[in-house]
């Protein structure tokens, strides 16, 4: 495991231990990279390297554009995803992959909640990832469904994983109520 700081973000590289293993980039809310890497190993996943990025300003770094707060007493979203993606693809990725043995067979991006939204958004703004996982992605984000339907990914991904909880849309918040409907619609394209 190696850790470095880039653009104010803490980056932890968990090498697979075998050459040319796939690599997954995971934007984390806290610092759960080690737990995720250990869980992947314990459940018998094929070897892969994990690059966990933490120290994020969640409502800025993961949001594709400005948007007023959708939760009571919450901060607004300040649309820094393009900047975050430039940092990830331009600085973090090359430095992290110098720590790996060989060349990754494929490169994926994954995230939970707003980071799941960011993972999908990255496919539309960059061609560096061939796979993505949006785990309980914030696909309720205003305008995102329309964005996906009016734009094409920079490259056709090999695989995309979506998940949404059974009760995520069962909320009084009218914006968040759209999460399941939006996830199903986006998954269908």
Predicted regions and their residues:
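N-terminal cap/lid segment of alpha/beta-hydrolase-fold proteins
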Residues: 1-16
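Serine-hydrolase catalytic machinery in alpha/beta-hydrolase-like enzymes
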Residues: 12, 20-99
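A general structural motif
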Residues: 20-22, 47, 104-106, 129, ...
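A conserved amphipathic alpha-helix that caps or lines the catalytic cleft of carbohydrate-
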Residues: 40-41, 123, 187
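Short beta-strand immediately N-terminal to the catalytic nucleophile in serine-hydrolase-like folds
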Residues: 106-111, 135
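Gly/Ala-rich beta-loop-alpha elbow adjacent to hydrolase catalytic centers
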Residues: 110-115, 119
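Conserved hydrolase catalytic core segment
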Residues: 121-131
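The feature captures the conserved acid-bearing segment of alpha/beta-hydrolase catalytic domains
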Residues: 139-189
């Amino acid at each position: 495991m190696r850790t470095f700081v880039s653009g104010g973000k803490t980056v932890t590289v968990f090498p697979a231990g075998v050459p040319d293993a796939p690599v997954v980039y995971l934007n984390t809310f806290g610092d759960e990279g080690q737990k995720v890497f250990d869980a992947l190993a314990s459940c018998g996943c094929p070897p892969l390297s994990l690059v966990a990025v933490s120290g994020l300003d969640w409502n800025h770094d993961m949001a594709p554009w400005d948007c007023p707060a959708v939760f009571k007493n919450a901060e607004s979203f300040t649309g820094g995803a393009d900047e975050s993606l430039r940092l990830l693809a331009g600085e973090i990725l090359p430095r992290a992959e110098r720590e790996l043995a060989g060349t990754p067979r494929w490169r994926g991006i994954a995230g939970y909640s707003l980071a799941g939204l960011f993972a999908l958004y990255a496919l539309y703004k960059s061609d560096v990832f061939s796979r993505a996982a949006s785990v309980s992605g914030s696909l309720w984000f205003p305008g995102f469904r329309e964005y996906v339907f009016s734009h094409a990914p920079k490259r056709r991904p090999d695989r995309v994983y979506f998940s949404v909880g059974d009760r995520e849309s069962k909320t009084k918040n009218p914006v968040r109520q759209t999460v399941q409907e939006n996830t199903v619609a986006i998954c269908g394209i």
